[in-house]
Amino acid sequence: MVRIAVAGAAGRMGRNLVKAAHHNPVAKVAAGSERPESSLVGVDLGELCGEGKFDVVVCDDLAKQIDQFDVIIDFTAPASTLNNLALCQQYGKSIVIGTTGFTEEQREQIDLVAQQVPVVMAPNYSVGVNLVFKLLEKAAKVMGDYCDIEIVEAHHRHKVDAPSGTAIGMGEAIAGAMGNKLSDVAVYAREGITGERTKDEIGFATIRAGDIVGEHTAMFADIGERVEITHKATDRMTFANGAVKAAVWLHEKPAGFYTMTDVLGLNDL
């Protein structure tokens, strides 16, 4: 049984992670945290999520429950995630990271810690999205040299970073398949007189509205035809179940940086 701690357990995603871990037959909800000022610190995690009493309460620092869990699942914010990453480094715990919006320096810090502890990090934990990443690599190799490539993503009004980590992951998959670095070809905003589109650029467009869980489309557009590869999520439990799957897979793995491609065994596709 893999003992799981959920960071940000009282948030929208946190509650789904608690539910997913509770219903996974080889996982156990063993700890959960919230900000110290939260009124939900001390509340039973099961009752918080409508799953009955777990006899595990929300704490304000996972260090206080360090002996209770094996793996942290963290979908919070960069600063909080890095704090939990340091905790894992100190105590030899594993971590599944779903947080997005890291700077390049923060990503380097994660890579460094992954030399000492097992880390799974992915922009999206949906099985479907990770299959899409593979499809995009193949499409880019076939069509990328002569098509205009655009990525459009839509999320709910509360999402604080843009473009989404998944959209960036799509761009990285496409750019990498074409032998490029995304930072060299990405165009994140267009306004005013921009001039004609350049050949190699990958454009991004962002929508924030209502309660959209997550929609992503990559477009390969030529003269006379275009191919669109789309993923639409309708329930956050898709991401939560994938993250718990990753946590179970990661348990007792050696130190290293892993992705959902590793978890799902997609490397040979």
Swiss-Prot record:
Its EC number is 1.17.1.8. Gene3D superfamilies: Dihydrodipicolinate Reductase, domain 2 (3.30.360.10), NAD(P)-binding Rossmann-like Domain (3.40.50.720). One of its GO terms (cellular component) is cytosol. Its main location: cytoplasm. Pathway: Amino-acid biosynthesis; L-lysine biosynthesis via DAP pathway; (S)-tetrahydrodipicolinate from L-aspartate: step 4/4. NAD(+) binds at residues 8-13, 34, 98-100, 122-125. The keyword Protein transport does not apply. It catalyses: (S)-2,3,4,5-tetrahydrodipicolinate + NAD(+) + H2O = (2S,4S)-4-hydroxy-2,3,4,5-tetrahydrodipicolinate + NADH + H(+); (S)-2,3,4,5-tetrahydrodipicolinate + NADP(+) + H2O = (2S,4S)-4-hydroxy-2,3,4,5-tetrahydrodipicolinate + NADPH + H(+). (S)-2,3,4,5-tetrahydrodipicolinate binds at residues 156, 165-166. InterPro entries: DapB_C, DapB_N, DapB_N_CS, DHDPR_bac, NAD(P)-bd_dom_sf. NADP(+) binds at residue 35. Pfam families: DapB_C (PF05173), DapB_N (PF01113). The active site is at 155 (proton donor/acceptor), 159 (proton donor). It is found in: Cytoplasm. Catalyzes the conversion of 4-hydroxy-tetrahydrodipicolinate (HTPA) to tetrahydrodipicolinate. Belongs to the DapB family. This is 4-hydroxy-tetrahydrodipicolinate reductase. It comes from Vibrio vulnificus (strain CMCP6). The gene is dapB.
